[in-house]
UniProtKB/Swiss-Prot annotation:
Part of the phosphoribosylformylglycinamidine synthase complex involved in the purines biosynthetic pathway. Catalyzes the ATP-dependent conversion of formylglycinamide ribonucleotide (FGAR) and glutamine to yield formylglycinamidine ribonucleotide (FGAM) and glutamate. The FGAM synthase complex is composed of three subunits. PurQ produces an ammonia molecule by converting glutamine to glutamate. PurL transfers the ammonia molecule to FGAR to form FGAM in an ATP-dependent manner. Keywords: ATP-binding, Cytoplasm, Ligase, Magnesium, Metal-binding, Nucleotide-binding, Purine biosynthesis. Belongs to the FGAMS family. Substrate binds at residues 99-102, 121, 245, 317-319, 540. This is Phosphoribosylformylglycinamidine synthase subunit PurL. The keyword Nucleotide-binding applies. NCBIfam families: FGAM_synth_II (TIGR01736), PRK01213.1 (NF002290). GO terms for molecular function: ATP binding; magnesium ion binding; phosphoribosylformylglycinamidine synthase activity. It comes from Shouchella clausii (strain KSM-K16) (Alkalihalobacillus clausii). It catalyses: N(2)-formyl-N(1)-(5-phospho-beta-D-ribosyl)glycinamide + L-glutamine + ATP + H2O = 2-formamido-N(1)-(5-O-phospho-beta-D-ribosyl)acetamidine + L-glutamate + ADP + phosphate + H(+). The keyword Magnesium applies. The active site is at 54, 100 (proton acceptor). The gene is purL. Pfam families: AIRS (PF00586), AIRS_C (PF02769), FGAR-AT_linker (PF18072).
Length: 741
């Protein structure tokens, strides 16, 4: 074995150095048992990253099995770089969401930027051209210097990378709550398009075929990044800044174009991104999936730092790198393409038939372990689960019913809450028009991207109200799926499938594991009912510090198909005189609501209820009406209730609304589920009402640029001009950022 100046196998075991790498005593013993001998330093490192939660899902795998992953249009489910769904005409959509939470907490610009880079590579490693980026962000209250710094730097990192690489950032969401103060969540999603014939797999097939390393050189950045992402943040986390990767979007652009060129060649057998766990995960996973092995000579790996050890080379998470398997004898074809793009393309190994990962360095074997042991044999845990005391208390509480005496003031204050307020400050930093396919820009219910050369378009969104999930994880899980689907339907799209990013605290705490368990129950039930299979995703646990865990935050990335661009619908009012309809009933449901947080400062009670059969029926009826051309505008009712949703429909158009509702002032802000606000031409009234059975006409669009909401007695409960609404909504975030902490 290696003569390098590293701890011996005896020292690793005696001093339990494996613990510093993230392995438990039992896990280290199991790894040694599988290999059949003591592990050296490099081998211990390989197991530590591959058996981390980030790579192995050892604490969540038992729950992920609940998700429906099959469907008539699913071409690739979980297990590859990204999932794929057929959209007919020999085309498919490829999409995936991933987290970069821990890196963004200590180095927000690079943490966010490399999160974008990694998710792009996941998509183009499948052979797809990325056409859109989205993100879902969570921060503490926008008051302290620290939170403002994290917010500004994360947004700048996303913009800096996405804008340079030439992929539009078209949508997302931002939520602000105290639980994210020290634990920001940064989830990045990418959507790509592909022809069926170009679909690639990350597999190392064909004994004797060549393993090639392409892209940027390997440095010491990101070593143990996967392990770092699998532990709680602490006061010592800043010392792990080297575990944060550094991105180069211009290198990524070259790599993207070169990879999309080589996928056209049948000399390419397999391709995978070197993401979490770098060269270890890409080589072990590609070999394991193909039932093969890989032998690599680490002397051949391009290095940008002197004296790198095998341990460092294998665990580095340097960005903009891919691992390819190429047909033996045709390496020159692949090299020629990468050289034309001024990129490394180096032969570093060969595919073997012994199902082992064998690494050599300076003429010595420095690691020799079974690939399946690394990629498949991590222990799987079903952690103890315990109902949190707060949940039992919430279930016993009388419903929270606020008293609203001044509805105008309440609406303006709600519009200025950072979670509801306009995110224009965020998305104006993104180039959302690059590639010139963006039809519906950020700010509506979902972004829409046209598919060139066809009459079709893709709608996409990210959604999760984590407050509902804290109050009731199972109900909140159902709502997260339903709201994402509602946003797509409001845009004229049929929901196709889901990619999820499950962000939670420490699963070793029974109350946290219970949250994970119950929310996955809700998510899976809703996916089955609404016909949206989960085709991939990511789990990010240990999102907590001494102050406590984040709310359960399973971010839902959902993509839908607009079958005809004529069906594209947006939220803004279109014509004066159009009838305003509310679909769905309003109940006095305020548990976990924006109003409760604003008035009380904390959450309690029961989450809004949802009937998935009713949800499905309303979505189908509304989509049918949209396809018939009966709907002028559509918007789902979410945070802040009907009053906020009506105001949002006025923000970007020269119209107002006159509405009458038989609701109390408080109920105007209730967050009951399965509701929509749509507008319809008077001439289409009968056909619309025959199609959408739950729709009730409540008023009309006016030219007055005022929002007037009357009660059943005809008295104006809300009466505000557009300028007041826009000022509160658009000015909130810039104003908070300028204020002194």
């Amino acid at each position: 074995m290696s003569q390098l100046l590293e701890p011996s196998a005896e020292t690793i075991k005696a001093e339990r150095l494996y613990r510093e790498m993230g392995l438990t005593d039992d896990e280290f013993a199991l790894a040694e048992k599988i290999v059949g001998r003591p592990l050296n330093f490099t081998e211990t490192g390989l197991f530590s990253v591959m058996w981390s939660e980030h790579c192995s899902y050892k604490n969540s795998k038992v729950l992920l099995k609940k998700f429906p992953t099959d469907g008539e249009n699913v071409l690739q489910g979980p297990g590859e770089g990204a999932g794929i769904i057929d959209i007919k005409d020999e085309q498919a959509v490829v999409f995936k969401i991933e987290s970069h939470n821990h890196p963004s907490a200590i180095e927000p610009y690079q943490g966010a930027a490399t999160g974008v880079g990694g998710i792009l590579r996941d998509v183009f490693s499948m052979g797809a051209r990325p056409v859109a980026l989205l993100n879902s962000l969570r921060f503490g209250e926008l008051e302290s210097k620290k939170v403002k710094y994290l917010f500004e730097e994360v947004v700048a990192g996303i913009a800096g990378y996405g804008n340079c690489v030439g992929v539009p950032t078209v949508g997302g969401e931002v939520q602000f709550d105290p639980c994210y103060e020290s634990n920001p969540l940064v989830n990045a999603m990418c959507v790509g398009l592909i022809d069926h014939k170009d679909i690639q797999k990350g597999q190392a097939k064909g004994v004797g075929n060549t393993v090639m390393y392409v892209g940027a050189s390997t440095g010491r950045d990101g070593i143990h990044g996967a392990t770092f992402a699998s532990e709680e943040l602490s006061e010592d986390s800043d010392a792990k800044r080297p575990a944060v990767q550094v991105g180069d979007p211009f290198m990524e652009k070259l790599l993207l174009e070169a990879c999309l060129e080589v996928v056209q060649s049948d000399a390419l057998i397999g391709i995978q991104d070197m993401g979490a766990a770098g060269l270890v995960s890409s080589s072990a996973e590609m070999a394991s999936k193909a039932g093969s092995g890989i032998e690599m000579n680490l002397d051949l790996v391009p290095q940008r730092e002197a004296g790198m050890t095998p341990y460092e080379m294998m665990l580095s998470e340097s960005q903009e790198r891919m691992l390819l398997v190429v047909e033996k004898g045709r390496e020159h074809e692949i090299k020629a393409t990468f050289e034309r793009w001024n990129l490394h393309a180096v032969e570093v190994g060969v595919v073997t038939d012994d199902r082992r990962l064998r690494l050599t360095h300076k003429g010595e074997i420095v690691a020799d372990v079974p690939v399946d042991a690394l990629a498949e044999d991590a222990p799987v845990y079903h952690k103890p689960s315990k109902v949190p005391a707060y949940f039992d208390a919430f279930q016993q509480q009388a419903p929270y019913i606020p008293e609203i005496t001044e509805a105008n003031e309440t609406l303006l204050k709600l519009l200025a809450q950072p979670t509801i307020a306009s995110k224009e400050w965020v998305y104006e930093q993104y180039d959302y028009m690059v590639q010139t396919n963006t039809v519906v820009e950020p700010g509506s219910d979902a972004a829409v991207i046209r598919i060139r050369g066809t009459n079709k378009a893709l709608a996409m969104t990210t959604d999760c109200n984590s407050r509902y999930l804290y109050v009731d994880p199972e109900m909140g899980g159902k709502i997260a799926i339903a709201e994402a689907a509602r946003n797509l339907v409001c845009s004229g799209a049929k929901p196709l499938g889901v990619t999820d990013c499950l962000n939670y605290g420490n699963p070793e705490k029974p109350e946290i594991f219970w949250q994970l368990e119950k929310s996955t129950d809700g998510l899976s039930e809703a996916c089955r009912e609404l016909g949206t299979p989960v085709i991939g995703g990511n789990v990010s646990l240990y999102n907590e510090r001494s102050g406590g865990a984040v709310y359960p935050t399973p971010v839902i990335g959902m993509v839908g198909l607009v079958e005809d661009v004529a069906h594209i619908t947006t939220q803004s009012f279109k014509n004066a005189g159009d009838l305003i309809y509310v679909i769905g009933e309003t109940k006095a449901e305020f548990g976990g609501s924006e109003l409760q947080k604003m008035l009380v400062g904390e959450l309690s009670g029961k989450a809004p209820e949802i009937d998935l059969a009713v949800e499905k029926s309303r979505q189908q009826q509304l989509l049918s009406a949209i396809k018939q051309g009966l709907v002028q505008s559509a918007h789902d009712v979410a945070e802040g209730g009907l009053a906020v949703s009506l105001a949002e429909k006025m923000m970007e158009c020269p119209f107002g609304a006159e509405v009458s509702l038989s609701l109390s002032a408080a109920e105007l802000f209730a967050e009951s589920q399965s509701r929509f606000i749509v507008t319809v031409k008077p001439s289409d009234q009968q056909r619309f009402e025959n199609t959408v059975l739950d729709a009730v006409v409540v008023g009309a669009v006016t030219e007055s640029r005022k929002l007037t909401i009357r009660n059943e007695n005809g008295n104006a409960v809300i009466d505000l001009c557009q300028d007041e609404l826009v000022k509160a909504w658009k000015g909130a975030i810039p104003c908070l950022l300028k204020s002194k902490a």
